[in-house]
């Protein structure tokens, strides 16, 4: 089964054929580290971590690069407001980023390059563009000359005339054409700066990714990915810079994830309806957040609401409960071989369907449907009077494998004695208040965690199942 990827560049699904057999070069645009990330910022790391995991599962050696923009207008503004220097703020939020995405199940990239650690290669990249006539200096700034690059607009599928009509030259900019964009910005008084052939300054945003992608992955990469909002102008400008310099295709497959809406309204800082990851993971299990994000195809928008999150949690718990029941039943199973082949054959069908979903542009929504199918099928098997260790182990292994591909964990942390006692007390209060629905819910939840309650004349006793 071959993998097909929807390529933003061609607007169609294409068979994935990497440049080098069994090797994948992948670049994902990382954050500007001036604040905590919100859930919209967190979608690309989760989506493309899952893509990476699946490629690795299929046997590819994935070289995965994701950068940090650690010098930028937003960072300088934050530094001025807080009375701190730019490196201090950047270091703080790089650490916060790692804490957040690690909690969400994302592996570290092969390399996490920072702009400030690669200034020499960025300056050299700009210098080469100037020498080739694709860039020009203007009073200490350096701009890319878009009219010199014939393919400008090919990623966003917009004619250059239309793009130019919507562009403008801002006050203080010294460029020749409204579509030209900054490669190097002359330092203003009091700003952090680096020495360059054009004077003191710092790089523009777009050049950073082109330079670092080239350094760590070469002139041509297999997959370049990021949020939908980056397609234009960021990724369009990356293509222009890189292909103008090398004369080679910059990236062969372009992948972009969709937006996140909050209660059916587009999430934005201007509307004040954004949710920070480090806040939401205090309220909800980070694994649930990831499962929720993957329950929708990565190119589609996601509507984020507490109601939908709770509904997703119910589904996730059903799978985890089936897994827990399988593990619990393993001890009492035998080497029974009757009917083994039938159940194992069904498991193979689920595995095939899961891979077919992932091969179809990494359709995690359909892949998760197969997780539900495995769990439901397992529950049916557990109704058998006699169960086989071989079949039980096959179910357990399959669930663990599929969850791992999606960056999810199945094991539940064992409840502490005091946590159990607190839940029992909450159940007692519910019964006193004749809230029998809550009482039953607590009992059932504890049962799912292998905690058995026994109501006696002396009170409620419990034991681990």
From Swiss-Prot:
Binding site for Zn(2+): 29, 209, 234, 238
GO MF annotations in UniProt: ATP binding; cysteine-tRNA ligase activity; zinc ion binding
Co-factor(s): Zn(2+)
E.C. designation(s): 6.1.1.16
One Gene Ontology term, aspect cellular component: cytosol
Subcellular location field: Cytoplasm
Pfam families in alphabetical order: DALR_2, tRNA-synt_1e
UniProt remark on cofactor binding: Binds 1 zinc ion per subunit.
InterPro entries assigned to the protein according to its UniProt record, in alphabetical order: Cys-tRNA-ligase, Cys-tRNA-synt_Ia_DALR, Cys-tRNA/MSH_ligase, Rossmann-like_a/b/a_fold, tRNA-synt_1_cat_dom, tRNAsynth_Ia_anticodon-bd
Catalytic activity entry: tRNA(Cys) + L-cysteine + ATP = L-cysteinyl-tRNA(Cys) + AMP + diphosphate
Stored SMART domains: DALR_2 (SM00840)
Keyword terms of this UniProt record: Aminoacyl-tRNA synthetase, ATP-binding, Cytoplasm, Ligase, Metal-binding, Nucleotide-binding, Phosphoprotein, Protein biosynthesis, Zinc
Modification Phosphoserine occurs at: 270
Taxonomy, superkingdom: Bacteria
Keyword Cytoplasm: yes
GO biological process: cysteinyl-tRNA aminoacylation
Main location: cytoplasm
Chain residues that bind ATP: 269
Annotated motif 'HIGH' region, positions: 31-41
Keyword Chaperone: no
Motif, 'KMSKS' region: chain positions: 266-270
Similarity comment: family membership: Belongs to the class-I aminoacyl-tRNA synthetase family.
Subunit note: Monomer.
PANTHER family documented for this protein: CYSTEINE--TRNA LIGASE, CYTOPLASMIC, CYSTEINYL-TRNA SYNTHETASE
Protein name listed in UniProt: Cysteine--tRNA ligase
Organism: Bacillus thuringiensis (strain Al Hakam)
């Amino acid at each position: 089964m071959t993998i097909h990827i929807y390529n933003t560049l061609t607007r169609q699904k294409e068979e994935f054929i990497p440049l080098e057999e069994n090797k994948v070069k992948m670049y994902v645009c990382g954050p500007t580290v001036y604040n905590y990330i919100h859930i919209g910022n967190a979608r690309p790391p989760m989506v493309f971590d899952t893509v990476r995991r699946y490629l690795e599962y299929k046997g590819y050696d994935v070289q995965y690069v994701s950068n940090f923009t650690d010098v930028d207008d937003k960072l300088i503004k934050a530094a001025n407001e807080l009375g701190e220097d730019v490196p201090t703020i950047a270091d703080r939020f790089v650490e916060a980023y790692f804490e957040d995405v690690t909690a969400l199940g994302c592996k570290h990239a092969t390399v996490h390059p920072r702009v400030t650690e690669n200034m020499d290669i960025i300056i050299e990249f700009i210098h080469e563009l100037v020498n080739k006539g694709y860039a020009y200096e203007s009073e200490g700034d350096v701009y890319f000359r878009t009219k010199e690059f014939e393919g400008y607009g090919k990623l966003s599928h917009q004619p250059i005339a239309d793009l130019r009509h919507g562009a403008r030259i801002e006050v203080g900019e010294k460029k020749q054409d409204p579509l030209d964009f900054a490669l190097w910005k002359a330092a203003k008084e009091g700003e952090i700066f680096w020495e360059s052939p054009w004077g003191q300054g710092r790089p523009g945003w777009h050049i950073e990714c082109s330079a670092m992608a080239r350094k760590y992955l070469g002139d041509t990469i297999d997959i370049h990915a990021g949020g939908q909002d980056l397609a234009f102008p960021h990724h369009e400008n990356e293509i222009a810079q890189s292909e103008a310099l090398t004369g080679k295709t910059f990236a062969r497959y372009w992948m972009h994830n969709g937006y996140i809406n909050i209660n059916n309204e587009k999430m934005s800082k201007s509307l004040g309806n954004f949710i920070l990851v480090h806040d939401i993971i205090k309220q909800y299990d980070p694994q649930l957040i990831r499962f929720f994000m993957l329950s929708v195809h990565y190119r589609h928008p996601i509507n984020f609401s507490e109601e939908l999150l709770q509904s997703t949690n119910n589904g996730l718990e059903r799978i985890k409960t089936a897994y827990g029941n399988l593990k619990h039943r393993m001890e009492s199973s035998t080497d029974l071989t009757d009917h083994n082949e039938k159940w194992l054959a069904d498991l193979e069908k689920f595995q095939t369907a899961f891979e077919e979903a992932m091969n179809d542009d990494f359709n995690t929504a359909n892949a998760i449907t197969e997780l539900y199918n495995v769990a439901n099928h397992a529950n049916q098997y557990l109704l058998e009077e006699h169960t086989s260790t071989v079949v039980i182990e096959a179910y357990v292994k399959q669930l663990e494998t599929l969850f791992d591909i999606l960056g999810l964990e199945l094991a539940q942390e064992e409840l502490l004695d005091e946590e159990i006692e607190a839940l029992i007390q909450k159940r007692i209060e519910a019964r006193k208040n004749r809230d029998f629905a809550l009482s039953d819910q607590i009992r059932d939840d504890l049962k799912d965690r292998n905690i058995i309650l026994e109501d006696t004349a002396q009170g409620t006793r419990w034991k681990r199942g």
